[in-house]
Amino acid sequence: MKNKYLKGTNANILLLGIVSFLNDLSSEMIMPILPMFIIALGGAGLIIGLIGGLRDSISSILKVFAGYWSDKSGKRKIFVSSGYLTSALFKLFLAFSKIWQHILIFASLERIGKGLRTAPRDAIIADCMPKERGKGFGIHRAMDTLGAVIGSIIVFLLFWFFGFSFKSIIFMAAILALLSLIPLYFVKEEKRKPQDINLKIGLKNLPRPLRLFILVSSVFALANFSYMFFVLRAQEFFTGRLSVGIPIFLYTLFNIFYAMFAIPFGKLSDKIGRKKVIIFGYLLFSLTSLGFAFFNSLTSFMVLFAFYGIVYAMIDGNQRAYVSDLSSEELRGTALGTFHTAMGLAALPASLIAGFLWQINPSITFIYGATISIISVILFIVFRNYFKE
């Protein structure tokens, strides 16, 4: 397994993978309990949508600027380091929340760190393995998600067997986030010349195929509302300790399947083309959303959360790799930042719409997601002549 997938992998990708492993170990101790923490402090469906949407949008608005600044300055590591540190600090503040408004503030501001680090980090990954970007992003995402798997297992154990409170778990997660900064010190950044560009020129110079792909993926982002609704959907059908334990278990299952398939689908996209893999991912998301709308047994939830993990394995790293394929090296940080920002700007209305529909009928939320996902596939087909394999 090691020889097959990691042979020839750049050291920076492995180091960044370790950083992401530790950071996601921290984050995924928080994420499966976050929607239930919000409910416990008085939040409701629309509040879940607001917090989920703001978290994605705040981080993504910063991504285009961080990507542009990293291109312009010729430096990427400083943004990556600042981002991980910022996230760790606001996770610590989150542990002391007493009302849902505190969660709204701290959970949203924690995403500033993600906004600072993501595009520059992805640009480093893209530059390290130019001929095998799908593999490079797949390896990074797999290590990231392995941390997520272990983190969600830990939170399940802490809650189910040791009776830890939500706040205690979040505090422990914040300490782990601070530890994730250690491997980052050893990442070696290649010297790059500062680019004489401004943000307007950088965006204008993005090629048309890239702009069209960002449009298509933004439509899909309108369907891909916050994971918290999937967790709450599972919680609806259980009571007592099971109403917390089962959603955490299912979220762990999601991460296991994500980790298992991230590298294989990255390598597959290197061979058959990213467009095909991404389209199949969109289609599977649509089917999965319909499943959440109409099935509610534990067995069906296990299958659906597994599919949900496979969807992310198909689209997450491959969308980033495809953006890198469609952009020039000089503007890669700007291109990735623009992509992430578009995703985040779509995330806020997506989650707000999902929250509004949830208050009418939770099933409608998932029917909405399935419908918009199909529209994104149709757009992919309409613009197919602009996209290279």
Question: Language-model segments: which ranges?
Answer:
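Pair of pore-lining "gating" transmembrane helices in MFS-fold secondary transporters
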Residues: 5-39, 108, 209-229, 306
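Helix-loop junctions at membrane interfaces in 12-TM secondary transporters
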Residues: 10, 93-106, 293-304
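Short amphipathic helix-loop junctions that connect adjacent transmembrane helices
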Residues: 33-46, 228-247
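Transmembrane alpha-helix termini and helix-breaking/packing motifs in multi-pass membrane transporters
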Residues: 36-40, 150-168, 349-365
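Structural signature of the two symmetry-related core transmembrane helices
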Residues: 78-92, 174, 276-291, 370
